[in-house]
Structures are given as C-alpha cells and as structure tokens.
C-alpha cells in the first residue's frame, strides 16, 4: 500500500516519508493526494519500521477498555483512530483513513496487541491519579 507524506501532520513522520530517495506517486489512502512523495509498505521496509517505531509509543498509551481500571467508564472508550485524532496531531486524514493506515502499518507487527486497533480503548495515564487532578 502506498501511503504519502500528506497523510501525516507529524513532521518526523513526514521527513521519514519525504526523504531524498522517496518516489512520487498517488496515495492509496486519500484519492486527493496525487503526485506526492509516498512510501510503499510492501517495499520500503526500513521506512515502515521507522514509522512503526515512532507511532508505537503513542499507541501504547492506550489499552483496551476491559483492561482499564474500574474507574474507567465504558462510555469513555473510543476506537484508537478517534482517540489519536482527538488527542494528538499525528494524522492529516479522517478516522477511517487513520484506521486503514494503522492496520496496514501494524498488520504483521508482533510487538503490538492487535486488540488496540480493533476494540474500544482508553488512555491509561488519564485514569492514573498520580498524573491527573481527578
């Protein structure tokens, strides 16, 4: 899958994608992203790993709702793509496209609990009293 620099707001990820040896092509994520610098998830394995390594810490801030403390309300649970869009400025595309990107990037990653990409999640740190005023 071809993912482009315009799919991201994060400058570090944009730099990974847009480095000197990047190819120009059309993005598979957003049909409006034409003639842009892309990386192919099936060919550019080094870039894939760099982007995974950059995104993984943000994903690890979240846990599936059944693993969160009793103080966590299930009503607070969100899909990861919504949580990331609400809490961070990593992506420059809509939730469905974020989901597609995450599923493509992490489809064979054994270091990530796939349930984070599929189930409702909550941020672990939000419910930890030592980090909040709650």
List PLM regions with ranges:
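Intrinsically disordered, low-complexity terminal and linker regions
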Residues: 1-134
């Amino acid at each position: 899958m071809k993912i482009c620099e315009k799919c991201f707001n994060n400058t570090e990820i944009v730099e990974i994608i847009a480095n000197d040896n990047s190819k120009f092509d059309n993005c598979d994520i957003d049909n409006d992203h034409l003639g842009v610098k892309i990386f192919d998830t099936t060919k550019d394995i080094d870039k894939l790993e760099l982007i995974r390594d950059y995104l993984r810490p943000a994903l690890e801030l979240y846990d599936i709702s059944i693993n969160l403390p009793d103080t966590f309300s299930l009503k607070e649970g969100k899909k990861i793509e919504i949580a990331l869009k609400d809490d961070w400025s990593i992506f420059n595309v809509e939730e469905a496209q974020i989901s597609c990107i995450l599923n493509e990037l992490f489809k064979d990653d054994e270091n990530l609990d796939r349930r984070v990409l599929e189930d409702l999640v909550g941020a672990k740190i939000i419910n930890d009293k030592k980090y909040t005023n709650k």
